[in-house]
C-alpha cells in the first residue's frame, strides 16, 4: 500500500485576495499554516489568465516552502518556460479553457502524444517530476506511461459530482481499477478534483493512491474553522481511511 500524502491547493486564498485587489490574504502565509497543520505539499495552479495565483506567488512559494511545491499548469510554451525557470518539485499538466470556472476534465494525452512527450522531457531534463491530470481511462493511462510521465493524477470530478449513491459507487470502482492498472505500469497515482470531507475517505482507501490534492473544500472549511484545523481534519480523515 502506497504512503498517502495530502497536497493542499491554495488557489482560492489568492481568489479571495484578488477579489478586492489587496495584498491579503497572502497565499504564502496560507502555505506556511497548511504545512504546520500536516500538509505534505502545496499545490498552485498558475492559469494563463492569472485569475488567482500570480507569477510572483509562484516565485515566493518556491523559495519559502518547507515541503514540496506542485505547480499545475497548461501545456503552453509560456508555462513550460516558467516551470523550467522556477523549478518546482512537481508539475501537473492540466487542460485549460479560459471560460471554465475550474478544470473540467482530464488531458487527452493519447490524442497529443508528441506534444506531451516533448513537455515531459523538457520538464524532466530540468529536474522536475511530471504528473498528467487524466480521466480514469486505460487508454489515457497507457499514453501517460508512453510519453514518460512518472505520475498521473486521476480526475475525481465525476465521482464527486455523482447524483446518486449508485452512480458514485460506479465511479469509485472505475477510479480504483484505473489506479490498479496505472500502478501495474509503474506509474505513481495521485487524485484530485471535487474531493470533500464527505467523499474523501473512499478515495483515500484505494491502496495505490499516493497523494490527494484538495483545495476548495479545505479553504471553504477554513472560512468557518480556521485553516490549520481544516487541513488537520482532512489529513485525519485520509489516514483514518487507511486504518
From Swiss-Prot:
GO cellular component terms given for this protein: cytosol
Please give the InterPro entries that the UniProt record associates with this protein. Answer: Aldolase_TIM, PyrdxlP_synth_PdxJ, Pyridoxine-5'_phos_synth
Q: So where does this one cross the membrane?
A: none
The biological process GO terms on file are: pyridoxine biosynthetic process
Q: In which pathway does it act?
A: Cofactor biosynthesis; pyridoxine 5'-phosphate biosynthesis; pyridoxine 5'-phosphate from D-erythrose 4-phosphate: step 5/5
Binding site residues for 3-amino-2-oxopropyl phosphate:
9, 20, 194, 215-216
Put simply, this protein is called: Pyridoxine 5'-phosphate synthase
